[in-house]
Amino acid sequence: RRSSDLMNRLTDKSTDFNPELTVKDDMTALREIAGRLSRHPEVESVCISQNSIPYNEGCSGASFRFPDNDTVWISTMDRWTTPEYYKVFRFRNIDGSGHESLVKALEKNTIIVPVDVADYYPDATFHGKDLLGKEVRMSDTNFRIAALTEPVRYDHYNIAGKPFTGTYIGTYLSDEQMETVENVAYLELSLRVREGVDDGFVERLMNDADRIYQVGNVYILDVTPLSKVRTASEIDNDNELRTQFCILFFLLLNIFLGVIGTFWFRTQQRRGEVALRMAMGANRKNIFYRLITEGLLLLSMSALPAVLIAFNIGYTELVDISQMAFTVPRFLIAILLTYLLMAIMIILGVLYPALQSMKVQPAEALRDE
């Protein structure tokens, strides 16, 4: 489990406020608090970052280019962090070495990027695993790509591989750079608790906050589990998804009743035909299969133009594909599921009236006709 500590600075209204402490002293105090937290028996790892925690409402941007290509700048989110960030949030190295190698890879002259960071830019010099070890230019400084992580997403409602929705540039947050932020409230202190720690950890930590985790003018204002940050960040998308599911259920119910009703009425109207076939020697099983086959044949004939129309709608991006890319496998799966759903509706619409028709004696059905 991960938590984010909200840091703050005492004001002159507090009796503990020391007006002689500078910004540099505040940042030193923040690092001291991070060190004390890392030694807590229930804490696994601690990191400091700036505008970089997952599900954060805002983000910073960064760009780099390759030295031999000054026309293509790869722009995306800037993950400005201390190395332990990759341990706290469990980023995975593509070489299978886990997060420990990422912690060692991030230094002042290196960056870490996901393996798909350049996929959005087809004219970039390098892509994929070829990025590893390459020199890049950021502002007026050269950096080396020291490690590649597996693709990540900004949240559950975005796809990986696109700028500001998944890809990022992981840069080193040095002591000097922390001082340029000036206020500890603009920095994030995140920690991961050990496995098996109960839900009372936050309460126990805050009980010790004033005694142990206040250094100089810097103190812990609040501790927020990342699950709550995620809920707050995704609540609008969650509500929209629920609304869409309600609309989808309503439409499916109407389609379900319409298709079943149509084939029910159609089969009911053919009672005389069923009786005549039975009178001519056809058995019930063959008649039933014939009615089902006719329904599925009508479905297949209407499905062909529907598939062509649906493919063109997706291919031309007339529908929203920002949250899930339009791919051939996805399209085929959707078509197959739709066909099966419609087939079930048709079978249900034919099943009961067909069985009822076959129970009627041929002479009685012909007399009714």
Where do the protein language model's features map onto the residues?
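Intracellular coupling helices
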Residues: 257-294, 359-368
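Transmembrane alpha-helical interface segments in multi-pass membrane proteins
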Residues: 251, 272-318, 333-337, 341, ...
